[in-house]
Amino acid sequence: MLHHHCRRNPELQEELQIQAAVAAGDVHTVRKMLEQGYSPNGRDANGWTLLHFSAARGKERCVRVFLEHGADPTVKDLIGGFTALHYAAMHGRARIARLMLESEYRSDIINAKSNDGWTPLHVAAHYGRDSFVRLLLEFKAEVDPLSDKGTTPLQLAIIRERSSCVKILLDHNANIDIQNGFLLRYAVIKSNHSYCRMFLQRGADTDLGRLEDGQTPLHLSALRDDVLCARMLYNYGADTNTRNYEGQTPLAVSISISGSSRPCLDFLQEVTRQPRNLQDLCRIKIRQCIGLQNLKLLDELPIAKVMKDYLKHKFDDI
């Protein structure tokens, strides 16, 4: 029946023929049909052009031919408003992406947003395509674009536990304190101590509270009775006297759960009773003065290595 329908509809027959050629990587047939006048910008029922199709299938040579014959990479499909670059990001097709990014359309596609406000960088971070993330940033993609829900690529990488993408984005100065400190609080809530340590080492603000209740990372550590997180936060300068919207300090939160002895409660009682020593106060202040984006330059300071290591918290017993 389909064959009969195709015979009566030559346009559909041509569409299926060129799609089959792309799927098979038959560049000769693709080129021949384009030279005979077939448009590379025709769209199927899903709004896909041949560029969408070949990018998703990983057919690099076909992508090159389509671009040579005027394919438009700015076209968005009808599924989610995705460009061919979004699909290349989804499947990690970095070589194909480079072809599109080296075209005259680069500025129009590199930060193009889907119907949900996702850029190709959102997609690459979500799927953990670290080489693709690097490529987009090499071509100067915006590092902190916001989706319609206010989410950045870094947040997606954290939630999906894409560690390599997280590090790459942070190395390119992604905002570690986005959404009033979401990342550090998320790491605490998930008891992800490696992320928690990474964010603190890179200068995350320890005292930013949730907008809905004012709970800081230290409050959340108390709620979870996570003494390791609490120690890390305290060592990096978390204020034990910060209050949530109910007027509770982290210690008060810990006591409200249970007054009986527990590791986190015992620790909070200990550090709340006595002030920080001058040495630790100096470290906290120096790191603040150096600033978030310059902490990675600590090694360039004209000071003794032991001081650099101290500023990096290398002697912490956690």
From Swiss-Prot:
Q: What is known of its domains?
A: The SOCS box domain mediates the interaction with the Elongin BC complex, an adapter module in different E3 ubiquitin-protein ligase complexes.
Gene name per UniProt:
ASB7
PROSITE patterns hit by this protein: ANK_REP_REGION, ANK_REPEAT, SOCS
> Could you mention a single GO BP entry for this protein?
intracellular signal transduction
Instruction: Please report the residue spans annotated as repeat (ANK).
Output: 13-42, 46-75, 80-109, 116-145, 149-178, 180-208, 213-242
Which keywords annotate this record? ANK repeat, Repeat, Ubl conjugation pathway
InterPro entries, A to Z: Ankyrin_rpt, Ankyrin_rpt-contain_sf, ASB7_SOCS, SOCS_box, SOCS_box-like_dom_sf
CDD domains membership: SOCS_ASB7
Name the domain of life. Eukaryota
List the PANTHER family hit by this protein, alphabetically. ANKYRIN REPEAT AND PROTEIN KINASE DOMAIN-CONTAINING PROTEIN, ANKYRIN REPEAT-CONTAINING PROTEIN-RELATED
Complex and partners? Interacts with CUL5. Interacts with RNF7. Interacts with PSRC1.
What is this protein for, i.e. what is its function? Probable substrate-recognition component of a SCF-like ECS (Elongin-Cullin-SOCS-box protein) E3 ubiquitin-protein ligase complex which mediates the ubiquitination and subsequent proteasomal degradation of target proteins. Plays a role in spindle dynamics and genome integrity by targeting the mitotic progression protein PSRC1 for proteasomal degradation in a cell cycle-dependent manner. Also participates in meiosis by mediating the proper attachment between kinetochores and microtubules.
| Name of the protein this chain belongs to | Ankyrin repeat and SOCS box protein 7
Give the pathway: Protein modification; protein ubiquitination
